[in-house]
Each structure stands twice: as C-alpha cells, then as structure tokens.
Amino acid sequence: MTSTLETRTVTRWVSLRPHHGQVPAEDLVDGPLYVEPFSAADLPAIAERAAGVVIGSAWMQDFQLVRAVARLGLPVIVQRGHSATLEEWLGVADYCVAEGNDQVVLCESGTRTHLEHVALDLTLLRAAKARSGRPVLADVSGDPSLAPAAIAAGADGLLLSPSASDADVAAAREAVTLFGALAGHEPPTTLPEARAAIDRVDAALATLLERRAELAGVVQSLKPVGGFAGRDMERERQLVAAMALRAPKLGEERLAPIMNAVIEAGLRLAEER
C-alpha cells in the first residue's frame, strides 16, 4: 500500500462498499492506505487512519458525500463513473476544491461497452489531464495487462484492485518504471522527483542494454566471422549517426564512445558463453 500519491506510482486501496456498512470501518482501515467509504459513517475512522480517500465511480455524483470527504483534508482520488462525461468528472474535483481541498487526483475507470465490459478511455484520460492540469491515474483493475498502454498514453499512475495479486502488482510497477521513463515529459520540480525520474530511465536503459546484448549474441552466431574480428565498423558508424538523430544534444561525438563500450561489452559477453 502507498501512503502518498506521487506521479508514476502504483496505488493499492481498500473499498468499504462490499461490506454495505455491516463491518465497522475501524476493523478494515488498519494502516496508511487509500479508502473508499460506504457512507458518511465511515469518515471519522478514515480521517483518523487513512492516507487518502477514493471517491468511487459508483458514487461520484453523491455530492453530499463528496463534500464531506473533501472536508477531511486528505488527498482524494476521484474515479470517473462509467457513464460520466468529462465535464461531470471534472465537476467532482471542483466540488472538492470548493470545500478547500485541492489535493485531488483524477482516475479514469473506463466506459461500459455494449458487451457489458468496461473499457479504459485513454483519449478521455488525456483530455482530463489537459483540461484540469491534475495528475490522472488509470484504473486497470479489470485488466492489469493494460498497464503499459495506460502509462504510454500519459497516465501518471495506476490504480489496482484491492485484491490484486503480487504478480499483477509487480507487473504494474514494471510498466510504470519502463514505460514511464519513455512517456514522462513533465520536468521534475524537486530533487527527489528528478532522482526518481533518472532511476526510471536507468531501469529502462538497463533492460534495453540486456536485450541488446542478447541480440548481439544471436548476431555473432549467425555471422561468418564473429567476435571482435568480425566487427563491421561501417555499420557501427551508421548506427551512431542514426542514434544522433534521436539524441541531437549528445551528437555523434559523444554517442560514439558510449556505443563502442556497449558493443564491446556485448562481444565479451558473447565470448564468455
């Protein structure tokens, strides 16, 4: 469970709705996590024990409860109702702000289709980010395999089912790390944010370097002459030139020694196998 909601995160939470008010909130909220209340009766325990509140898609138009939640002063995640428009969704965030709480994060929860499935609307997610200027999560509870697509579309984080398996959580975190490194364009404003962004880029870079080394090993096995003796310097120059088009600030002069080190590491690895 996360105690704070930062961008590029995976958030787990607990919902009190399935218990229909039959179980006291005190028995279910046992740590700093995000909680979806069943009714206003749950709010005192949430205020005392929770790190934040989830305004679930099923009751985002219960404006009395929305206002009461906002007055707790905790961070709020506003899920979009499955049939709610963009304006209705953003309007709930405005209700929270009107109560003096601007700690609002939006969460795209999907639209119910004619097949009775709920499908994420990534276009609406991007529109919500552009219109509101707020972080927007993607609820991938129904299909955690959509995590990479959601992050690539610009989601600032993912919301998983309270019952998500450890494997689903691990896969979602990997999607946030790898795809977040490629999709994130907002400049960090603090040192911890900047370091976290660099860590994500480094993780993605390590994954790509490992994959490149594997492919280089395949190439060595297919070439008539492999290893250092079979290096194709002209191809390597073309590779660096092509990379410089993607990384013009680094340019060929800086990229050349980097790629030489990468290529030599791959060749040595191939020789060791």
Tell what function each PLM region has.
Residues P18-A25, G81-A84, E116-L120, A167, ...:
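Catalytic cores of large soluble enzymes that bind and process phosphate-bearing ligands
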